[in-house]
């Protein structure tokens, strides 16, 4: 076994031991609660690829923690204002949201799943099979905040284990996702607060099932999570937050109607 494989296996074991400990000690609804509303912000918890050092929450490191839970707080406030969807509001500690691992059967209770910093993620074969099952059964995955060809390669390495038989394609400006409520055919890169990193050209990509349903919405070379997180930050451009809210609403409505 290579050193990188050993490190990833160790990180995965540590992640699930920690998740299990939190379940047992606190009964934390973020980790083990059932749905209490039509829509919860469900964030995917995953192990990092070897060498990742991004993100921190609750004493645990992990790229999945990026923007947590400010992004949830602001986005769910926006969805409540902009739609009539029965939405579970989230506070700054993440209460009201859900933290979901792919080994948790509760993943099937949430039709919309958000994965951030997927240029840092690692899915083993069991998790890849579970994600495929989730998506084939009607789930919708939105991935966000990864940049450049190196991070793209890490993302696709795991995604190819999920769908070795399906291609990733560019979304055309006429795709229903971009028009289901707001018309978003004039697409603009949504930057992180610190500006773009390795990537300069934004891409809206996706993976479809055999019936043409979009299962995975891929935001590449952009950072919608930062736009939500910094909605009240005077240093972050308000038009970008407004645009990121509109994209999120379109993704939500598409996922709940397809």
Question: How would you label these PLM feature ranges?
Answer:
Residues 45, 79-86, 117, 139, ...:
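Sec/Tat-exported extracytoplasmic proteins
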Residues 85-98, 143-146, 166-174:
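Surface-exposed patches in mature extracellular/periplasmic domains of secreted proteins
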Residues 72-76, 128, 132, 152-156, ...:
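Extracytoplasmic/secreted envelope proteins and their assembly/folding machinery
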Residues 41, 107-152:
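Short alpha-beta junction capping motif
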Residues 22-112, 118-119, 223-224, 230-258:
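Aromatic-Pro/Gly-enriched surface loop or interdomain linker
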Residues 5-21:
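Bacterial N-terminal signal peptides
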């Amino acid at each position: 076994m290579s050193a990188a494989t050993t490190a990833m296996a160790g990180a995965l074991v540590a992640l699930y031991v920690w998740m299990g400990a939190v379940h047992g000690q606190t009964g934390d609804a973020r980790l083990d609660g059932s749905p209490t509303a039509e829509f919860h912000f469900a964030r995917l918890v995953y192990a990092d690829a070897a060498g990742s050092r991004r993100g921190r929450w609750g004493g645990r490191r992990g790229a999945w923690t990026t923007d947590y839970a400010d992004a949830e707080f602001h986005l769910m406030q926006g969805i409540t204002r902009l739609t009539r969807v029965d939405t579970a509001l989230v506070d700054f500690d993440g209460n009201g949201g859900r933290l979901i691992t792919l080994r948790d059967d509760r993943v099937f209770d949430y039709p919309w799943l958000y994965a951030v910093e997927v240029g840092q993620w690692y899915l083993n074969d069991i998790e890849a099979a579970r994600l495929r099952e989730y998506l084939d059964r009607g789930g919708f995955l939105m991935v966000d905040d990864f940049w450049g060809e190196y991070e793209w390669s890490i993302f696709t390495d795991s995604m190819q284990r999920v769908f070795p038989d399906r291609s990733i394609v560019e979304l055309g400006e006429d795709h229903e996702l971009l028009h289901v409520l707001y018309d978003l055919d004039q697409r603009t890169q949504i930057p992180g607060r610190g500006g773009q990193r390795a990537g300069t050209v934004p891409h809206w990509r996706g993976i479809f099932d055999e019936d043409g349903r979009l299962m995975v919405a891929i935001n590449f070379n952009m950072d919608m999570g930062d736009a939500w997180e910094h909605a009240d930050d005077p240093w972050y451009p308000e038009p970008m937050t407004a645009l990121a809210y509109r994209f999120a609403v379109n993704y939500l409505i598409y996922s709940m109607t397809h």
